[in-house]
């Protein structure tokens, strides 16, 4: 395999793990592009991205343009003479002139099996939709949103106890190895590109805090999927006793309830059972305002009066 001269573009920890894999490979990372430093923490101090911090540790030149649309930034990138540009959760749009600059173009690591779940939140949307499988796609970038030809795909079963946090970790483990495999095949000219089937494409829009509100008029299975998708952010919740109560862990009880949706059917050490449109949702772990996430059994010790059987939890429509 002929080592490649690589420009790496990425910003968060997920991207940094891929950069780390490249740094320990035979390839040469000649430059790193990342988002400008952002205010963070209580003091709102300007803080470098995880990718920038890693690049500086390895004395790699770092570029932080606010945009790659300006000719000056494009000429600066072209002057680096890279064979290929690897893009992982960078956060800036790459114009066509940039995509066409490296000899082998630009490739991207995406956290889904394309063309399903193009866009910003593929891990979360896969969980919420009840998908049984996800994975990583290495694709050749074009000007569309995750529409480029697919070069390599990995597959990962979604387990019942997976959350967005656990899937993120699993895909962050799969991605770097897949990237190195794709680069090796590209270097040797043995990789064939596969067009995406537009008929199978859908989009994973960013999650919003508004979406995180639980509606017990939905089936229990849907709510269980939702809670897993919104863990660790923005975390599913419901309003009760004038408080926002976050829900971290649930399970589905298949037995039907004759109670109205949102009614607390039982509350004890096992959890709080709530009637839904189909089946019951058992809440195992919650978080009261100003508190840490706790097992329901511990919350009932101090707030059992809030969750007595027969209590009706208001639906979003009723409380607006």
Curated annotation (Swiss-Prot):
One of its GO terms (cellular component) is cytosol. Coiled coil: none annotated. Transmembrane segments: none annotated. It catalyses: L-methionyl-tRNA(fMet) + (6R)-10-formyltetrahydrofolate = N-formyl-L-methionyl-tRNA(fMet) + (6S)-5,6,7,8-tetrahydrofolate + H(+). Its EC number is 2.1.2.9. Gene3D superfamilies: Formyl transferase, C-terminal domain, Formyl transferase, N-terminal domain. It comes from the Bacteria. InterPro entries: Fmt (IPR005794), Formyl_trans_C (IPR005793), Formyl_trans_C_sf (IPR037022), Formyl_transf_N (IPR002376), Formyl_transf_N_sf (IPR036477), Formyl_transferase-like_C_sf (IPR011034), GART_AS (IPR001555), Met-tRNA-FMT_C (IPR044135). (6S)-5,6,7,8-tetrahydrofolate binds at residues 112-115. It is an enzyme of class 2 (transferase). Keywords: Protein biosynthesis, Transferase. PANTHER family: METHIONYL-TRNA FORMYLTRANSFERASE, METHIONYL-TRNA FORMYLTRANSFERASE, MITOCHONDRIAL. Attaches a formyl group to the free amino group of methionyl-tRNA(fMet). The formyl group appears to play a dual role in the initiator identity of N-formylmethionyl-tRNA by promoting its recognition by IF2 and preventing the misappropriation of this tRNA by the elongation apparatus. Belongs to the Fmt family. This is Methionyl-tRNA formyltransferase. The lineage of its organism: Bacteria, Pseudomonadati, Pseudomonadota, Gammaproteobacteria, Alteromonadales.
């Amino acid at each position: 395999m002929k080592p490649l001269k690589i420009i790496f573009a990425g910003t968060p920890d997920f991207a940094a793990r891929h950069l780390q894999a490249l740094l320990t490979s035979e390839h040469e990372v000649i430059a790193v592009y990342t988002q400008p430093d952002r205010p963070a923490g209580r003091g709102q101090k300007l803080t470098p991205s995880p990718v920038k911090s890693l690049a500086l540790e390895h004395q790699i030149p770092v570029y932080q343009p606010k945009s790659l649309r300006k000719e000056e930034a494009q000429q600066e990138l072209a002057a680096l003479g890279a064979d290929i540009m690897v893009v992982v959760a960078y956060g800036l749009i790459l114009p066509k002139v940039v995509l066409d600059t490296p000899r082998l173009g630009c490739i991207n690591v995406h956290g889904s099996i394309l063309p399903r779940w193009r866009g910003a939140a593929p891990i979360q949307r896969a969980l919420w939709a009840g998908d049984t499988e996800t994975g990583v796609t290495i694709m050749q970038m074009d000007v569309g949103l995750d529409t480029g030809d697919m070069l390599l795909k990995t597959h990962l079963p979604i387990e019942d106890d997976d959350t967005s946090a656990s899937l993120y970790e699993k895909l962050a483990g799969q991605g770097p190895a897949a990237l190195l495999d794709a680069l090796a095949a590209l270097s040797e000219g043995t990789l064939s590109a596969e067009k995406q089937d537009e008929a199978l494409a859908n989009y994973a829009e960013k999650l919003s805090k508004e979406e995180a509100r639980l509606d017990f008029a939905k089936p229990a299975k849907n709510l269980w999927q939702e809670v897993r998708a919104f863990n660790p952010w923005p975390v599913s919740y419901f309003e009760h006793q004038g408080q926002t109560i976050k829900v971290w862990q649930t399970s589905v009880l298949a037995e039907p309830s004759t109670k109205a949706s949102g009614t607390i059917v039982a509350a004890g050490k096992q959890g709080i059972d709530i009637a839904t449109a189909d089946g019951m949702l058992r809440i195992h772990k919650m978080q009261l305002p100003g508190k840490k996430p706790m097992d329901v059994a511990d919350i009932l010790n101090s707030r059992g009066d809030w969750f007595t059987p027969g209590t009706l939890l208001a639906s979003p429509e009723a409380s607006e």
